Amino acid sequence: MSDMVDLKKFVTELGKTQKELKNVIEQAKDIGLELKTNFKMTPEQAGKLYKYIVDGIKEQIQANQPTKNPKQDNKDDLNTAATPKPLAKKASKTPKKEETKAQPKPKKTKEKKKEAPAPIIKKKEIEIVNTFENQTPLVENTPKAVSHSQIEKAKQKLQEIQKSREALNKLTQSNTNTTNNANSASNVSNAKKEISEVKKQEQEIKRHENIKRRTGFRVIKRNDETENETENSVTESKKPTQSAAAIFEDIKKEWQEKDKQETKKTKKPSKPKATPTAKNNKSHKIDFSDVRDFKGNDIYDDETDEILLFDLHEQDNLNKEEEEKEARQNINDRVRVQRKNPWMNEAGIKRQSKKKRVFRNDNSQKVIQSAIAIPEEVRVYEFAQKANLNLADVIKTLFNLGLMVTKNDFLDKDSIEILAEEFHLEISVQNTLEEFEVEEVLEGVKKERPPVVTIMGHVDHGKTSLLDKIRDKRVAHTEAGGITQHIGAYMVEKNNKWVSFIDTPGHEAFSQMRNRGAQVTDIAVIVIAADDGVKQQTIEALEHAKAANVPVIFAMNKMDKPNVNPDKLKAECAELGYNPVDWGGEHEFIPVSAKTGDGIDNLLETILIQADIMELKAIEEGSARAVVLEGSVEKGRGAVATVIVQSGTLSVGDSFFAETAFGKVRTMTDDQGKSIQNLKPSMVALITGLSEVPPAGSVLIGVENDSIARLQAQKRATYLRQKALSKSTKVSFDELSEMVANKELKNIPVIIKADTQGSLEAIKNSLLELNNEEVAIQVIHSGVGGITENDLSLVSSSEHAVILGFNIRPTGNVKNKAKEYNVSIKTYTVIYALIEGMRSLLLGLMSPIIEEEHTGQAEVRETFNIPKVGTIAGCVVSDGEIARGIKARLIRDGVVVHTGEILSLKRFKDDVKEVSKGYECGIMLDNYNEIKVGDVFETYKEIHKKRTL
């Protein structure tokens, strides 16, 4: 039993851990050896188990193994000693063939199948099992792939080795007697040698830990015809046996040289094929798990028909890093190519702006125009295009000036002038209506036209009465309160010559109406009351006339009143720069009386003389160009407009457009109420047939047909709508700060309805002037015409909402709906009353002004702390009076430490209402007891005053 091999030591010497003991026991079962953890084996059993575990040679062990023939044992020992240990072998039938030569071959085959039963291997069936994927081989610099021709050459050399070994076995049969006694000892020594070789392999593995390990291929090919030829071709050979390791070294060198040549030809190395999946249990296996260094070992045995081929693709791993670099380089190249596309070449907005700034400074690449024509209403991007500037530079310049705009916002005249100064441009502002106007007929005879005279002046100075006297019709009596509410235009004949008069309101609210009257006039007549002199609206009228560059004639009215001083009036006008003719000046001062009619003929003659001097002419042929003086809605006729023609002729049936309104002239009525068919220059008429009420001051253009008129009106409507949106988005820094500060601003929603467009415009402007930092009027809707139920629905959900009507009255249904919605409707006939009513409403919503009135002062001389009551200060009144219940400040060292109300005031032990100067008193404050000697009480009253607008 001393020669028995312990299983645990056997496992340890194999280089395996005790955890892998179970795997060794399972492998022992495969060869018919039943083992347990503490069992021991004979050296013969240990040798067979070692061969099976290490080399893969499967030799079955019988449960009751018979005594072996000494000759056969001797032959086995000789074979073991003569042949080096192969790296991988399979159980073969060849040793049984050498046992008895006299036995026939079929009998040997049967015995062979009985001794080592194994699954039948079909011809050329291969199964690949990858059981050692993570391990890498110890062999370095192995070739890449094994071709079929190389395998055939290796087979031929291995067959020659097999034949030489069979001849060597015959020579060793004669020495069986001498080696019989040492059979058992040799087996033990062989086992020990094998164990020592395993240890050497483990040491070799440790020394090659840093080397990439490769997986081996075991290709097993079964061919019955080759087997029969091998059995019958036993020949003697006295040549020395060449080791398989040396043969493989030669093969390896040949393959490496061929691989180098192939690598030079092809840039991309061939990739190893994927391992096929085992589909069939009957197919043979190619084991990937055996990892060996084949140097110095025989890899072939004459007793087996298997060939062990190693994965010789080390060149792939050596070039792996280079392949990754090339792949990354290819990816980078592709990315660079993709960036060179037409979209990526376009730079961002910032990059474009930077480039263009450089170009703008370079006069050779970008030239800025010195003089350009800019429309009166132009967008930011249009200005940049016309001025040949960078859009970003224009927006940046406006931003630096405190105006935040977008490229679609409109620029006003001030902004255009600032930009022109910043970029050193000469600009000429053009009228925006030129693009909508039809070119005038250049071929034609200009004929004399009547002068257009505008009467302007201060309110109640007698403008309408004077014009009424001229027309012999008392129009002023029909006006509410005797005040003209909107423009009136009339034709007057004098000495067979016609004069067109335009009457403008004198109230301050109608400033824009006076401005329009001055723009369409040829001569301005300024009416001044001799008993009142020059007033605010008089100065304003003079400024409008001066801006329109029209001559001015002064009419000194109310000369019939006693104690009038015309020289004083002339002196006041001279101070304004308007010197009379009799004082050596250029301006006519005509004394008139609208009440008696004195001086009217002299005034008309002066107007005609001035017109003759001016030589007023116009072309009567061609399409008409007129100015809308006033627009309104009349019952039964719809939208109507009072127009005065400047050039051409307007006839019934002509198509036209005025701003957003368009239509065809249905009827024309003069100032006398008569129907007319044609309207020539400087003539005034009331026309019908409009799609909507045109704004006062708009230009009416005659066109060829309705389609053109509609198209131009729609185009203008779109333009104005975009302009309105631009105004809503364009905000300056100051406006933005004001919006943030006025977050608690009270708004009064208002709807304004008037009889005419001019009156509506004047009311809106007057109401907006009443806005202040606390209360503001918000006009949510305005229009010409009566109050409707839709107007009520707009303000039904708003608090403090008001509907204002001027010269209109609501119907019964509208009044009932207003009560239902709790909406206030206020109607007026005089603009004074409307503005004053809204001013009172705003004042009621505004918080009053609080003022303080100082009443007295007392100094603290001593303090008394009374339990459950508080601190009472003994004081002496030093100024004024101290009263109970009044507000007081407690001042300590000049600093107010408390403000409250005097809760109790006593004189000795008596409660008093007030204490005068020089007397002592006791003061107790409400909810404050931190009073010290030396403090001062200062009493005051709060006086509330109403705000004024």
From Swiss-Prot:
Q: What ranges does the record give for the region G4, renumbered to this chain?
A: 557-560
Map out region (G1) in residue numbers: 457-464
Statement: the UniProt record of this protein carries the keyword Protein biosynthesis: yes
Localization recorded for this chain is: Cytoplasm
- Region spans: Disordered: 61-122, 139-159, 171-284
Domain tr-type G, chain residue ranges per copy: 448-617
- Region G5, residue ranges: 593-595
Question: What UniProt keywords apply to this chain's record, in alphabetical order?
Answer: Cytoplasm, GTP-binding, Initiation factor, Nucleotide-binding, Protein biosynthesis
**Which Gene Ontology cellular component terms are annotated?**
cytosol
Q: Which CDD domains does the protein's record reference?
A: IF2_eIF5B, IF2_mtIF2_II, mtIF2_IVc
The record's listing under InterPro entries reads: EF-G-like_DII, IF2_II, IF2_N, P-loop_NTPase, Small_GTP-bd, T_Tr_GTP-bd_dom, TF_IF2_bacterial-like, TIF_IF2
- Name the residue ranges with Low complexity bias: 174-190
Q: Which family does it belong to?
A: Belongs to the TRAFAC class translation factor GTPase superfamily. Classic translation factor GTPase family. IF-2 subfamily.
This chain's protein is named Translation initiation factor IF-2
Organism equals Helicobacter pylori (strain J99 / ATCC 700824) (Campylobacter pylori J99)
In the UniProt record, what gene is named as encoding this protein?
infB
